[in-house]
């Protein structure tokens, strides 16, 4: 089986870190040991610097919505071209904490940036490059933000309004309904059930990949 790019998506507090551990365990059970992890924004020295600016902002200078999305795509193209594509080319599997769907949901849905602009940015920056599988962890924003607050201080985006996260979630669900490579898992369930659902999704998907 050729190397694959698997992405975990979801709102704050959805449990992406736990989900990534579950995915790694499952892949290793199938004999896939050669893999790396990425996160967005971030994953390269330049992209990590952009991550800090996006997450925390700059004191005294509001970050405009368009500047935010352009910084995200700058970080993304650095990661894809310098890390993800080379890894896949040498036979390494890549498990990513967020990818382009986050921008489509957060900036396109949450910020309300024009859909045509978001599509144009994606196509210009990424071309036809897409994850092989995206697991979207869905849960009500109220639950996710409560979990996020329990982790500690919230960043600039996590401090957004509930309406912002409602719009973001709606855009996630919209994309998931349209794209067969995006599988939705109910992340409001107990963690054991979420893990079991992820196992099932991966088991079925890996069988499909093995059977061609």
From Swiss-Prot:
Metal-binding among keywords: no
EC number: 2.7.4.9
Enzyme class (EC, first level): transferase
Residue positions binding ATP: 10-17
Keyword tags: ATP-binding, Kinase, Nucleotide biosynthesis, Nucleotide-binding, Transferase
Database matches in CDD domains: TMPK
GO BP, sorted A to Z: dTDP biosynthetic process; dTTP biosynthetic process; dUDP biosynthetic process
GO CC terms: cytosol
ATP-binding in keyword set: yes
GO molecular function, one term: dTMP kinase activity
Entry-linked HAMAP family: Thymidylate_kinase
The name this protein goes by in its record: Thymidylate kinase
Organism encoding this protein: Photorhabdus laumondii subsp. laumondii (strain DSM 15139 / CIP 105565 / TT01) (Photorhabdus luminescens subsp. laumondii)
């Amino acid at each position: 089986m050729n190397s694959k790019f698997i992405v975990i998506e979801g709102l704050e507090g959805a449990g992406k870190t736990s989900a990534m551990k579950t995915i790694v365990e499952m892949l290793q059970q199938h004999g896939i040991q050669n893999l790396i992890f990425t996160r967005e924004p971030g994953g390269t020295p330049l992209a990590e610097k952009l991550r800090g600016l996006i997450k925390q902002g700059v004191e005294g200078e509001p970050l405009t919505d368009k500047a935010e999305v352009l910084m995200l795509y700058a970080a993304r193209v650095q990661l894809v071209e310098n890390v993800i594509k080379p890894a896949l080319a040498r036979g390494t599997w890549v498990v990513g904490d967020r990818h382009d769907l986050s921008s489509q949901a957060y900036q396109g849905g949450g910020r309300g940036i024009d859909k045509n602009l978001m599509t144009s940015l994606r196509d210009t920056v990424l071309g036809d490059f897409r994850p092989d599988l995206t697991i979207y962890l869905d849960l009500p924003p109220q639950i996710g933000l409560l979990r996020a607050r329990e982790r500690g201080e919230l960043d600039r985006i996590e401090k957004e309004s509930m309406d912002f996260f409602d719009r973001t979630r709606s855009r996630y669900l919209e994309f998931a309904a349209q794209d067969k490579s995006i599988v939705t898992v109910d992340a409001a369930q107990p963690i054991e059930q979420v893990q079991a659902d992820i196992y099932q999704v991966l088991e079925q998907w890996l069988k499909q990949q093995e059977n061609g």
